[in-house]
Amino acid sequence: MTDIKKSEPAEDYPPEEGCYLRGNDYSPVAVVVILRWRREQTPADIENLVRVGVESGAALAGTLQTENIGIEKIICNVVSNPNIRYLVVCGPESPGHLVGDTLLALAKNGIDDRKRIVGTDAPTPFLFNVQPEFVKRFRDQITVIDLINEGSPEVLRQAVWSCYQEKPTLFGKYEFYDSGAYPAEPLSGKITWKITQPSLEPKSDEERAHRENIQTLIGRIRKAAEKREHSN
C-alpha cells in the first residue's frame, strides 16, 4: 500500500465561520457549491450538494456567494489544512458575482498589485483582507476542479471519490489521486475585515487618486471653516 503522508491541521482549523459542513480533516478535497440565491432562499438541491460533498469524504463542503470576502474565507480555511489538495467547484454559476469563474481565475492567474484577481469579469474580485502569503499558498496547495453548472450529486460524489484514490484515477478530463499533505506547516489566521465593502473601493489608481484629492480638499475646507469660527 502506498504511504500517503498526512499532517495535522492548524489548531484553530477551520478558522473562518460560514455555511459549510466539516468532514474528514485528512481528506484531500474540499467542495464549494455556488449559491446564486439569498442565503434564506437556498434551494434544497443546493443544500443536498453540500451534504453529498461531506458524505462522500470531503474535508469541508459549503456554499459561496461572493467573489471577494467569501473567497477570502475559503482561502483561510484551506491553507489551515495542508491535507486539502483539491477544490471542487460546482453548482449553477452566479450571473452577478461570477464566483465560479473568479475561483478558476484565482487559481490560474493570482492577484495583481491592487489585490484584484486577474482574468475574471466579476465586478469586485478583490482580496483586501488576506495576506499575499495566504493567496500564494492557496494557489500552490490546491488544484481547482471545474464542475461549474454541474448539479448532479452522482457526478460530485464521483469527483470527491477520485481525489482520495491511491493511484491516478480518471475523472472526465482530469486525473486525480491523493498525493498527500502539502509539504509545509499550516497557515493560521482569519481575514482582517479592514475592508468590509469591496464594491466601494476604488477600481483604479486614477480613481483612488481622485478620491484622495477630494478628501484633501474637504480637509482644507474644514480647516478654513474652523479658522473662521475661532476668529469670530
Q: For the regions a protein language model found, what residue spans apply to each?
A:
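Conserved mixed alpha/beta catalytic, RNA-binding, or beta-rich assembly cores of soluble enzyme
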Residues: 3-118, 196-201, 205-232
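Divalent-metal-activated hydrolytic enzyme cores
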Residues: 110-194
